[in-house]
Amino acid sequence: MCIRDSGRALDEPASNKIRWGMLINTNQCSDECDACVTACNEEHGIEDFGRPTTDTQWIRKLKLTNDASGETINVPMMCQHCENPPCVDVCPTGASFVRADGIVLVNKHTCIGCRYCMMSCPYKARSFVHENLENQLPHAPRGKGCVESCNLCVHKIDNGDNSTACSEACQKDGQQAILFGDLNDSESEISKQLKKYKTTEVRSDLGLNTAVRYRGI
């Protein structure tokens, strides 16, 4: 039997004892760096068709400006993997769902491309695949006419690599802005930092209990 780093067998279903999430330190996210975006695109075979309004974006970097001070910060924005996701509530086929470990996913076989989930997402984190897809990667199947979004590199997690392409690239590039880990493990680095620092849940007023939190906002 093969065992993951988390102690879970490779053929064992996801467990609600774990909740995967991210802590993003905007103070460490620089203007000139797009390592997270590039890594995500390469990991999942996401191509740039030169149509910025419709091209698939699993991560996009937003720039926020403080009107009073004029200070700007960079905010990597992706699916926030809500505990109570609106996208799941509005999906008519059940294609959008939350896995036991908190990862929000889309079943490409049952997605009908209605895009209700895109309209319901307060983070504008989902994309509709308009183009024919070529050279797809075996670990990251995608489909024209489907909606998709960040899946926290679920293929890596399910193969025992408890990391994401974006967090690895951010660490490698020296920015160290993105930290990935188990929110339910009090001894994990992400849990320790969440206790130590003031963090923000984007649109906390909606009561979605997101798995992605930010510092510096």
Regions found by a protein language model. Give the residues of each.
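Non-ligating segments of multi-cofactor redox enzymes
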Residues: 4-217
